[in-house]
């Protein structure tokens, strides 16, 4: 049985910011189809920067990024879904309804010039129902709870049927029950729909339970490998520079 082909290849990646600060250095990872990768590290570790490099929003200073076989990232971004940090997603001043927000997610498929057709609107309806938010379709984004908002932005990312899903601390500020539901949805998308996922989060115990691989960053790369080889207490101690013990609590560590 042949080994799964990498859909994202990052080799010797370095990113220096305009102020001269090195945000990332020496990052190497090959992401294969159906991977669910836990991206962990303290604030300022470069997790968001790495995701923005993959999205083509930040240009690397050195190294290469190959997405679905091409170093021209814009060529294949239509296959990538993105869920931003919850603080960005839950702007109370956003004037859009739930339906309009998810419909915008079809842009990579439908394009801006041709407009949305019946097929696009049907896909939006199906996606809203899949994530259990169809009854919220006319509500404004600013009127939603944290958990509802994150389902909407996950639906927006998924409505274009991506092959790779990037999530940047999607559950910060969200209640425990909503977090559990959100991670269960991600787990199903990965296992049942074979969506490749890179998930940045501080919920280390939870995401390392559902992930098959782990990438630890603090500007440089501390660990990258299989979940079964990840020694949480040791690696997290290195990352955060103080002892950490993961405890079991309810359904989550």
Model-assigned labels for residue ranges:
Residues 161:
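Conserved catalytic motifs of ABC-family nucleotide-binding domains
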